[in-house]
Curated annotation (Swiss-Prot):
SUPFAM superfamilies: Helical scaffold and wing domains of SecA, P-loop containing nucleoside triphosphate hydrolases, Pre-protein crosslinking domain of SecA. It is a peripheral membrane protein. It comes from Bacillus cereus (strain G9842). Residues 788-807 are annotated as: Disordered. One of its GO terms (cellular component) is cytosol. This is Protein translocase subunit SecA. Belongs to the SecA family. GO terms for biological process: intracellular protein transmembrane transport; protein import; protein targeting; protein transport by the Sec complex. Its EC number is 7.4.2.8. It catalyses: ATP + H2O + cellular proteinSide 1 = ADP + phosphate + cellular proteinSide 2. Zn(2+) binds at residues 819, 821, 830-831.
């Protein structure tokens, strides 16, 4: 074990030695940088940018750029970065984590790599845990960057889209992790590229990196929306479908399980819902609900495909006959069956977009972070984010006194001892910080201190601005501050001059399940070589002690006749606690790793959809893409209707009916013509006819209008199907563990089923786009619309509505208007006939 530790330590030492050489280079440049005037110093920024365009790299510029920032910081902020801060900056620039102890100046350290990487013009994001810290750092460090001629932006939750665009366009952007993630998701839901706010993700420096990438790694960011009319529509569609007659108003192909409305059925629907054209883009949702209602009634059979159990629809696995609890049919079929069976239609909020911090931050070209405590999670940072943890030496030696844990028999005895210790230190005038794991504990100690007449502050993470004031007072003479462990991170406790001899006393009321959090609490004392003392009070009734076998120790204390006021101070107990913490940390790491494996399935799918969506937004002409979709749709339809080996069993009539209903007009493709062809030859004449019809449609309107119509269709279909797919993947994920029977690996099942569902969604997108392009009439006031209004599910969401740009279109013939060909018939019964 000692050998391994030594090896790890040696690796860190080698890195420090290597960086020390660069620090010496930076120091050597000081004599040439110091004499420069402010204007000449500013001019260095332009010089560096020019050198980058001529082929130099940011690595080449590092020593000189760091020397420039150091001199500028001295002039503007009155702070001169130490050598150890230069090392921290080098580690950050190289895409690693700088572990720098509390009070060592992480914020100032970050300015060095931020400036250097901002010279590329690609943007640098400085990420903090809350908006107060983002604003503070942007205001303070922004002065330095602006002095050197760089632009600084701050991205807040309350900002408008225009303000966010300005913030992201700056060379350096300060933001919270939540806001960055939500902006990324919102950018992939917009309908016009002018509405996007983010640029490509280049370089991020995360402050308190362990808090964001480890503690919050399992929290997904979700933008959700309510499909409010959905429940009602399913009921209306269900009532309508019950009135339909087989063969006459809908046709059903037993072999392909394909069901669709006939011309009579379409007319009946238009009358029933008082609309002119069921295939109009305005009625996408209605048509979808009718189709799913048809499938629910005609294709899906109770006690064969599903069962009704305790008021819920439960799917039956067609291969094993097992109930697939937790799984729901996608694309609204499940709700249609719920309407059919008269059970409650579940209209839970729909996830429109989701991402975890793990996957968001892994998209950056380069990522780095700073914290006082990262070494214990080094394996996770290396394996998941490809970042090494480099422990930066402190500027002055740490002289803090970390005392061994005191263990009491009961919680009551422990808290009495804690309060007694606080009272004694308070009398001497020593400032005390009390760390608690839970808010209830802090309230209990607060009551006990009030009874003893000790004035104190309670610190929790609810009010960030007030938090900074409390922290500022926490180092004053006789101050007592009770804080939950995470509160106050990012703000230093500075000692008053009259308490420098004592230093700060940090009292922990129990061990956290993570050593890292305990180390953060300890690190509050003894900053920058100040004196200080830390002491943890434990009891046998603490959660960690209860979980990891403290019964023997409790029995031992009973045997020794120890009462509640007598603690034991034992290295053996401290080691047992540490080993328990390591086990919990290991379990938590495994859980985060597993989350990432599951999330990677959706990540790959999300990247495909978002990339294609981006291409659609930027494309001037989608015709080629849509023709490809039509080709795929036709080929799938041909394959589905000709899958039997014997030619007589092919369902050519079903194929022609499908084509007439969804893509072509009656008579475009004849049954007898197709019967003369082999399956691989059938697609060609069908596709040729489709292209001919597409050309006819293009002649009916100006090109600009046709191109916008294509985009409207693609966006509406893709966004609807994708949100339904995310929902289906959510249900699959929830139910997959319930099917871990036999030797089945749930992750592998999730990957396989998720992939099959994604392929099915892509096919469904292609088919629906083809149908709407060929069958829908063009609206007069055509505009792109969001499928559902999204709302960020997080305190820092901004549910800002996307501004839509109307695209005004020319005159179009209504379905019930007289046809312009002069036949005297209504347009829908003449040139606008819909099969």
């Amino acid at each position: 074990m000692i050998g391994i530790l030594k090896k790890v330590f040696d690796v860190n030492q080698r890195q420090i030695k290597r960086m020390q050489k660069t620090v010496e280079q930076i120091d050597a440049l000081e004599s040439s940088i110091k004499p420069l005037t402010d204007e000449q110093l500013k001019g260095k920024t332009l010089e560096f940018k020019e050198r980058l365009t001529k082929g130099e790299t940011v690595d080449d510029l590092l020593p000189e750029a760091f020397a420039v920032v150091r001199e500028a910081a001295t002039r503007v902020l009155g702070m001169r970065p130490y050598g150890v801060q230069l090392m921290g900056g080098i580690a950050l620039h190289e895409g690693n984590i700088s572990e720098m102890k509390t009070g060592e100046g992480k914020t100032l350290t970050s300015t060095l790599p931020v400036y250097l990487n901002a010279l590329t013009g690609k943007g640098v994001h400085v990420v903090t845990v809350n908006e107060y810290l983002a604003q503070r750092d942007a205001n303070e460090m922004g002065q330095l960057h602006e002095f050197l001629g760089l632009t600084v932006g701050i991205n807040l939750n309350s900002m408008s889209r225009e303000e966010k665009q300005e913030a992201y366009a700056a060379d350096i952007t300060y933001s919270t992790n939540n806001e960055l993630g939500f902006d990324y998701l919102r950018d992939n839901m917009v309908l016009y590229k002018e509405q996007c706010v983010q640029r490509p993700l280049h370089f991020a420096i995360i402050d308190e990196v362990d808090s964001i990438l480890v503690d919050e790694a399992r929290t997904p960011l979700i933008i959700s929306g309510q499909a409010q009319k959905s429940t009602e529509l399913y009921m209306f569609a269900n009532a309508f479908v019950r009135t339909l007659e087989n063969e006459k108003e809908y046709s059903f192909d037993v072999k392909t399980k394909n069901v669709m409305l006939t011309e009579d059925g379409i007319t009946k629907a238009e009358k029933a819902f008082h609309i002119e054209n069921l295939f109009d883009l305005k009625h996408v949702a209605l048509l979808h609900h009718i189709n799913q209602g048809l499938r629910a009634h005609v294709v899906m059979h109770r006690d064969t495909d599903y069962v009704v159990q305790e008021g819920e629809i439960v799917i039956v696995d067609q291969f094993t006959g097992r109930l697939m609890k937790g799984r729901r049919y996608s694309e609204g079929l499940h709700q249609a069956i719920e309407a059919k069976e008269g059970v409650e239609i579940q209209n839970e909020s729909m996830t429109l977009a989701t991402i975890t911090f793990q996957n968001y931050f892994r998209m950056y070209e380069k990522l780095s972070g700073m914290t006082g405590t990262a070494k214990t999670e080094e394996e996770e940072f290396r394996n998941i984010y490809n970042m090494n943890v480099i422990v930066i030496p402190t500027n002055k030696p740490i002289i803090r006194d970390d005392r061994a844990d005191l263990i009491f028999k009961s919680m009551e005895g422990k808290f009495n001892a804690v309060v007694e210790d606080i009272v004694n230190r308070h009398k001497q005038g020593q400032p005390v910080l009390v760390g608690t794991v839970a808010i209830e504990t802090s309230e209990l100690i607060s009551k006990m201190l009030t009874r003893k007449g000790v004035r104190h502050n309670i610190l929790n993470a609810k009010n960030h601005a007030r938090e900074a004031d409390i922290i500022a007072e926490a180092g004053m003479k006789g101050a007592v501050t009770i804080a939950t462990n995470m509160a106050g991170r990012g703000t230093d406790i500075k000692l008053g001059d009259d308490v420098k001899i004592f230093g700060l006393a940090v009292i922990g009321t129990e061990r956290h399940e993570s050593r890292r959090i305990d180390n953060q609490l300890r690190g509050r004392a003894g900053r920058q070589g100040d004196p200080g003392v830390t002491q943890f009070y434990l009891s046998m009734e603490d959660e960690l002690m209860r979980r990891f076998g403290s019964d023997n120790m409790k029995a031992m204390m009973d045997r020794l006749g120890m009462d509640d006021s007598q603690p034991i101070e034992s290295k053996m107990v401290s080691r047992a606690v540490e080993s328990a913490q390591k086990r919990v940390e290991g379990n938590n790491y495994d859980a985060r790793k597993q989350l990432l494996q599951y999330d990677d399935v959706l990540r790959q799918q999300r990247e495909v959809i978002y990339k294609q969506r981006q291409e659609v937004m930027e494309s001037e002409n989608l015709r080629g893409i849509i023709e490809g979709m039509m080709k795929s749709t036709v080929e799938r339809a041909v394959a589905l209707h000709t899958q039997e080996e014997i030619e007589e069993d092919w369902n050519i009539k079903g194929l022609v009916d499908y084509l007439n209903t969804n893509l072509l007009q009656e008579g475009d493709v004849k049954e007898e013509e197709l019967r003369r062809l082999a399956p691989e030859e059938m697609s060609e004449p069908i596709i040729a006819k489709l292209i001919e019809r597409y050309n006819d449609k293009e002649k009916l309107m100006p090109e600009e209008q046709m191109r916008e119509f294509e985009k409207v269709v693609v966006f509406r279909v893709v966004d609807t199907k994708w949100t339904e797919h995310i929902d289906a993947m959510d249900h699959l994920r929830e139910g997959i563990h319930l099917r871990a029977y036999g030797q089945i690996d749930p992750l592998r099942e999730y990957q396989m089923e998720g992939f099959a569902m994604f392929e099915s969604m892509v096919a469904s997108i292609e088919e629906e786009i083809s149908r709407y392009i060929m069958k829908a009439e063009i609206e007069q006031n055509l505009e792109r619309q969001e499928v559902v209004q999204g709302e960020a599910v997080h305190p820092s969401s901004d549910g800002e509505e996307a501004k839509k740009k109307p695209v005004v279109k020319g005159d179009q013939v209504g379905r019930n208007d007289l046809c312009k060909c002069g036949s005297g018939k209504k347009y829908k019964n003449c040139c606008g006939i819909v099969q």
